[in-house]
């Protein structure tokens, strides 16, 4: 698969190649319109949002900027996903969910039969589209009402370990690293005030974004009672911070090393929670990246 988010996720979800499943890139050229389009954009099912209102300049994802509408769905995926097949095999009884920091990651893994939720860079909510639901479940509304991301107002991304513990030769400030208008190219990285247009983007480009997604996932497991009967349930959690950090700072950055170290702790927290609520002996855990990452040309 091509090294892009939607391509890798859909290949994992379907077991098919891009030529078969249809997701050949994050954006591609549409012959009918003569324009580039975003992979999972679908104008028919609009975004289901409890708090609407866009922050001007909040979107920094070049693929997302191609979107002309907020609607999202898996209708462009041409092959059945594992989750679709599981739903059929259990006569529709399996509970199927996919969550992520990115919409395209969640949509691909949920397939047509599951429910996808993803983080908003506008308000920090976990959101979905009306393709999946007509209204948020109470537990989702309750989680969003807690406004956990906003509690990081004025805080910063700090190194997990003392600077000397990181790999030698990784300088914490290179001219090719991206500064998200005040996030900086070296530690600590300030999130800034919660009303800053890039506040939620900065949070998601850090280990805090993964921790917020984990907390949402824990609430999902409890509220939907996953794994509590003899029917196989399915949950995909796509942590997005490593991808974002690599794009902005590069694979050889101190930021990348730190976000991986912190993700390791987040995964340990997840596994402990699953063991407590479901039992690891009752759970099949599959780990995978969705794609690789080349070094920054200036570094290589």
Predicted regions and their residues:
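Generic beta-sheet signal
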Residues: 232-237, 283-285
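Short, solvent-exposed turn/loop segments enriched in Gly/Ser/Thr/Pro and often Arg
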Residues: 1-11, 98-107, 238-240, 289-292
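Short secondary-structure boundary/capping segments
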Residues: 111-122, 249-257, 292-300
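Short, solvent-exposed loop/turn segments at the edges of secondary structure
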Residues: 4-7, 230, 280
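Stable alpha-helical elements in mature extracytoplasmic
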Residues: 8-12, 78-82, 92, 213, ...
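Metal-dependent active-site segment of extracytoplasmic phospho-/sulfohydrolases and closely related
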Residues: 262-300
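His/Asp/Glu-rich, glycine-adjacent segments
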Residues: 16-17, 23-231, 240-247
């Amino acid at each position: 698969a091509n090294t892009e988010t939607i391509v890798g996720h859909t290949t994992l979800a379907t077991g098919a190649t891009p030529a078969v499943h249809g997701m050949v890139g994050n954006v591609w050229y549409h012959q009918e319109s003569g324009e580039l389009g975003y992979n999972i954009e679908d104008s028919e099912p609009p975004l289901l949002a409890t708090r609407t209102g866009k922050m001007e300049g909040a979107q920094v994802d070049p693929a997302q900027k191609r979107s002309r509408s907020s609607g999202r769905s898996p209708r462009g995926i041409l092959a059945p996903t594992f989750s679709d097949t599981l739903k059929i095999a259990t006569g529709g009884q399996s509970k199927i969910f996919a969550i992520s920091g990115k919409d395209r990651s969640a949509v691909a893994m949920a397939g047509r039969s599951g429910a996808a939720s993803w983080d908003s860079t506008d308000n920090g909510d976990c959101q979905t589209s009306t393709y999946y639901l007509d209204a948020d479940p109470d537990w989702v509304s309750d989680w969003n009402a807690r406004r956990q991301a906003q509690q990081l107002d004025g805080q910063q991304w700090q190194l997990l370990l003392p600077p000397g513990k990181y790999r030698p030769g990784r300088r914490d400030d290179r001219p090719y690293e991206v500064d998200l208008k005040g996030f900086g190219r070296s530690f600590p990285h300030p999130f800034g005030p919660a009303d800053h247009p890039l506040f939620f983007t900065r949070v998601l480009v850090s280990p805090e974004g993964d921790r917020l997604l984990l907390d949402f996932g824990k609430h999902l497991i409890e509220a939907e009672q996953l794994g509590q009967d003899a029917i196989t349930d399915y949950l995909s959690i796509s942590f997005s911070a490593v991808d974002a950090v690599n794009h902005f700072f590069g694979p050889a950055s101190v930021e990348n090393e730190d976000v991986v170290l912190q993700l390791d702790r987040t995964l340990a927290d997840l596994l402990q929670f699953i063991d407590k609520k479901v039992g690891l002996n009752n759970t099949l855990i599959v780990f995978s990246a969705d794609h690789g990452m080349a070094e920054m040309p200036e570094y290589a």
